[in-house]
Design a protein with these regions (language model features):
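Structural/interface elements that position substrates and couple domains in central-metabolism enzymes
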Residues: 1-118
Length: 118
């Protein structure tokens, strides 16, 4: 591992912790806006094994998708005026989609027609 890898990893580690703390704070605000108990809400979130899994933290997975994750994220954004973190998450995901489309388009264009598959 290079010193640059280690330094970015250390900075990323602290930013990840900050993101988790900020997410919890945002969920507390949303919970209180809707008269929910934030401790119960966080218990529901932590009950899902995927929250503890490292599987979704691998580089190269691309943007999130599926049926429930985008829909439920948008629902929480719409449910509160204080969801700046979740709005940023949605924005990052949209940028990742756009980036993947551009990269995919460029690589397809660079290939000779006879080497491209549909």
């Amino acid at each position: 591992m290079s010193h640059i890898d280690a330094e970015i990893g250390k900075l990323g580690h602290n930013a990840y912790i900050a993101t988790k703390v900020s997410f919890t704070e945002e969920m507390e605000q949303i919970s209180r806006e809707h008269s929910a108990d934030p401790h119960h809400v966080m218990s529901v979130i932590h009950a899902d094994r995927r929250v503890k899994s490292k599987e979704h933290l691998r580089p190269g997975l691309g943007p999130y998708g599926g049926k429930c994750v985008p829909k439920d994220t948008r629902e929480l954004i719409n449910a509160s005026h204080t969801t700046t973190l979740l709005s940023a998450v949605e924005s990052v995901n949209e940028n990742a989609k756009d980036s993947r489309l551009i990269i995919g388009t460029k690589s397809a264009v660079r290939q000779p027609a006879e080497n491209r598959s549909l």
